Amino acid sequence: MIDREAPAAVLAPTPLLRHAIERACRRIAPVWPLKNFVAVNPFLGFSDRSFHATCAMLHRVARIDTLMPRAFYREAIRNGTIETADLAAALAAAPADWRLPTEAAELLKLADNDRIARKPPAVVATVAEVLNELAAGDRHVARTAFMTDEISRWCAAYFDEGQSVWRMPARGLRPYAAWRAWVRYDRNPEMMGIARFRALVADMPDDYVAAIATVIERLGIPARAVEDYLHQALLEIGGWAAYARYLMWNHELAGDRDDTLEQLLAIRVVWGYTLFAQRTDTAFREAWRRAMEQAALPPLDDQLGGDPDFCINMVLQEAYEIAFRRRLLDRLAGAPAARTAGARPAVQAAFCIDVRSEVYRRAMESVGDGVETVGFAGFFGFPIEFVPIGHVTGRAHCPVLLRPQFTVCEAVGGTSEEEDSEILVMRLLRRRVRKAWKSFKLSAVSSFIYVETAGLLFAGKILSDSLAVTRTVHDPNTDGLDDDLIGRLGPRIEPRPVGGRATGFDPAQRVAMAEAVLRAMSMTGPFARLVMLTGHGSTTVNNPHASGLDCGACGGHTGEANARVAAAILNDPDVRVALRQRGIDIPDDTVFLGCLHDTTTDVIRLFDIEQLPASHADDLRRLRALLAKATSLTRLERAALLGIARGAATEQQVVTRSRDWAQVRPEWGLAGNASFIAAPRARTRGIDLGGRSFLHDYDWQQDKDFGTLQLIMTAPMVVASWINLQYYGSTVNNAAFGAGNKVLHNVVGTLGVLEGNAGDLKVGLPWQSVHDGSRFVHEPLRLTVLIEAPLEAINGVIAKNDIVRELVDHHWLHLYAISPQGRVSHAYRGHLLWQQLEERSES
């Protein structure tokens, strides 16, 4: 018997309910598909709340921990990472209502115990959670897990982007309608003992909002708790909810609206209601009544004093971060004296601000006299859609915060239009043949015959793949092209219409972009004879998350196209004439080179060197020798973290890892990232920052209206914070914010991975990306940002941009200012207020 009587204080399908649905959906952070897996702040939906309140809320609503276990902090205290002064500073900064001891010694005593309070904080329960708590055996627990598995199975079929051989019927319908059409023939739930499942779903309204309202009413969710309940329901299918949030993000970026996530929410709450309808027994209904009474209590997310254990862990986390900032500021204070500017550099190399570039830049500067390196976002200020040969649409090579402004097509150099057409036709034909062959191998009948008859023919391929001699699959970037053509591929910047769209750059656009990029990099002279614009990518095999190791500023793709486009435009003689009229004089003998830094092997590839004049042959030879030395030094430094012993074969082992299909840690990615520094390179040159800092060159004295400062704080700084918080979340709670064990991953729908063969879509980073099997390689620290600019200018950017204000005022990062003398002089305290620091001290 189903209790259809609506209790008091519930919501009907009103604008208030629609608002609760929208807010619950916006609490979910998006996750990008595997083809362009970019780092995302898992707390993005809580940017309007403080870090502390968000941690409390997630613990209250979903019992999700966002801090490390207390044993982690105890170990940091024992090994000297956290000092007594750090604990004292954290206590002094803690709000008074946290009811903490005033002395560090007392805090140390409390930290020795894992828990001091008895009562856990209140939670907003879902039907699944109450069922799990009451389960006398495994059956009801299995039902709640079964619900997640069934929703995930349906989502995998509905959202599939070409992996499945058989397409799901009704994919043309919107999600809620498509799911109800699917359920009409799905007897799995009833076989699991969920009586009348299909009838219960059919009884729901056709409109998804009305269906949510019906469930809210029948469950008796208190009006105050509706948003929390809906949020908790989404968290139980958090991976697929995150993918639906990505679809919503993309539509909103284009000025449209998408309700996929809201419809997925309707599917989840209706599913939960079918479980509720099974239990009419007194024990369950009494437990549910108590849960709803608890949910009706007003939350106190901003008043943490009622949960002393949470407060202790939070202040220990603060002390842990203070300890890092103390060491960082001391290191920066010991920087060598800045060299006098003005002399022409021997070589200039612009790298992405990615923390992996810091190691290579330091190595490059140490092995060559007159080497000048620059840090800038890896898309080099060119927000392009790059369209490979044979594709109708392209890939966004820019931060996901932006939309591409230009379309650039890939082309084979030195060909006529007729040859281009032949190359295109041949590539499409080969890809179709491969697709047909794959379909044959995977078909229901031929798969068995194929394995029996042709399996041995692949023995050589399996052996060569296992020995890391060959790739396990064709490189999708060059699939279907002849080897002699691959080396001639490159972006075409000449303007021409393609498929009814304008592509390339006209003369005015080239000049405007060239000036903007050079000024944003603070690169206005003097210029070296060779200037490297170095994007980055990675080389791995059998790695579903491979794009996550590529350039985040390029939307999860390599920075090759952007670097080559920028170099081609800056080498344009007409552009240089126009730049001279705008105050940027690039010498005639300066040549820009598009380059690509492979962060797995630390090899730098130089493009279009055949276009170098003969006068630069010696320059090129010296550059290659310098890069070889820098590569060797960088590999040796990274080898220690990879667990590779130093020796004659060290460098070869680094390269071998990039081709090893069994390697779960081909490189460490951005593990360890902890700081972002926007200042002239002179402030950090010669300092070993351990590959943990995003380094963005910025000279505020060249930034007349502080437009570049605004660009840095609203784009690269925000992206760096996203990366930092993704690593933070995947470290403190990999089950909730990470992707689990990479060894167990199975790709689903080409969109993401499952851990095993069922369960929710995984988000975030695999465990192997933050842990080496015995210890954490990534330290869970919020980003420390240091900017050399006047306080008034920084405040101006904060005041004008909500996205920045929320980050700094709500403590999602720590902001510091560097004085014109190069000293870290002020700490941001919120609401446009700063505290002056004493020299070489931490607050």
Swiss-Prot record:
It comes from the Bacteria. Its cofactor is Zn(2+). One of its GO terms (cellular component) is plasma membrane. It is a peripheral membrane protein. The keyword Coiled coil does not apply. Part of an energy-coupled inorganic carbon pump. Forms a complex with DabB. This is Probable inorganic carbon transporter subunit DabA 2.
